[in-house]
Amino acid sequence: MGVLKIEEIPHYTYEDYAHWEGKWEIICGVAYAMSPAPMIKHQSISNKIARQLDEIFENCKRCKALLPIDWKLAIDTVVQPDNLVICNENLDKAYITKAPKIIFEVLSKSTAKKDEGIKFRLYESEGVNYYILVNPDEKMAKAYSLRDGKYIKIGDFIDEKLTFELNECDKPLEFDFSKIWE
């Protein structure tokens, strides 16, 4: 059996992705199949995150909390964060193009490595202000804040509150982690 050459590996684009069935992401042209359906615990936590983000961003009209939506970073890179906050983005398109201000990824066995590795570096390089990795099994979230182009760990959160400071909002906004584990 011969060795696979780099030029023989498929390089996918958004155009390819737009025609696929099922849930996929592409990062730098590499296709990643997503879990068919998240576990109930994953969905429950994601829904609680979404509700709380909706509430805290109610008074910040320039920002919107969203559930998974395509974020098209390049012709060959499209991801779908579990929960995200966008600001000053056109809401009439099928996907977003600007970096979200906040991203939550709820870890699962099938996505943890990608969320903690390639997506961590991708979100950092794209300028996502806050990245929160939520571990349902440990009931703990690791929060990172972007400082000078690099993520700095803010801390591990179980029942604490995290304050988001965004230029688009008149005042800091507080997220209560104790509410997502109930």
Give names to the regions the model predicted:
Residues 1-182:
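Gly/Pro/Ser/Thr-rich low-complexity, intrinsically disordered segments predominantly at protein N-termini
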